[in-house]
């Protein structure tokens, strides 16, 4: 990301921000609430458009118009407020909107296969794919969100304050999983305002203050 600027009315949220994130690393963004961390990542994922600046992914210029476009280019952002459908199963949530079909019919064998592969990568294979998401813990629901991103081929995973609702045990499991994703070549962007967490999980970090 090069020279990113974003204003909301008279408030300058981001002012000439530069950021490099590499494959196979956990890169943290740290700063107080309102520093611009989430806004910067919303621009990367397509949820918000920059006023000025450039984004490059794998050497290609990238101008995301919306989150669907961002995911198609390989970028997924997991928010504090999860966007799952609680009445649907784990596997239905993982492939929601991208269900393999033939004509008007869903290909359930392919759904089971693809969802199962994503669940194994994210350590969810102890759960039945048919389990309703509403019955899962917050930590497990977070993993379903990550599995959804992995299933569509995203290689840049943005986690926005992911530990805010987790116990210490769940945090340790999440950090272990983040390390596994890094070792598989994923670029993980970790947004936090807790310096101790950043020291524990990140390979590099950038600080933001007032954009």
Predicted region positions:
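Glycine-rich phosphate-binding loops of nucleotide-dependent enzymes
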Residues: 1-211
